[in-house]
Amino acid sequence: MSTSNPDLIELAREYFRRLDAGSPALLELFAEDAEFYFPKFGVGRGRDQLLELITGLGGAIESIEHDTSAYKMTLAGDTVFVEGTTRGALKSGERWAVGETPGGRFCNVFEFRGGLIGRLAVYLDPDYAGRDEAGFLWGRQGRSW
């Protein structure tokens, strides 16, 4: 697959669309030997481990929405850096929304090879609902989310 660099930003947007839809076609965006990182999962390799990550998240997350229209997307060669926000709900019924709750901000680093994701690193706090009270070292009062 031949892809020009500006198309890589669109491929990153497509990743978020498929992720939000829970589409099995999400895996098609990844190279067979893709490497990825997600907090508390660690580093994974290949589509089988990626499916394991997605299945685990699907067991906890009821819905998630990425509004890519406001994202900061930076292209550097075959790498796309994305700073963005999410909103969603956990299967427990707890909800999160950036600006309203502590969870919801993230940064992804996509490295593309041959028009596919060859490496993806996701940096976020996976405590979407803010359950980890001990992690709020400065307290919750007076904070902007």
Residues covered by each model-derived region:
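Hydrophobic pocket/interface hotspot
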Residues: 15, 26-27, 34, 46, ...
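Short, solvent-exposed loop/turn segments at secondary-structure boundaries
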Residues: 40-41, 80, 94-98
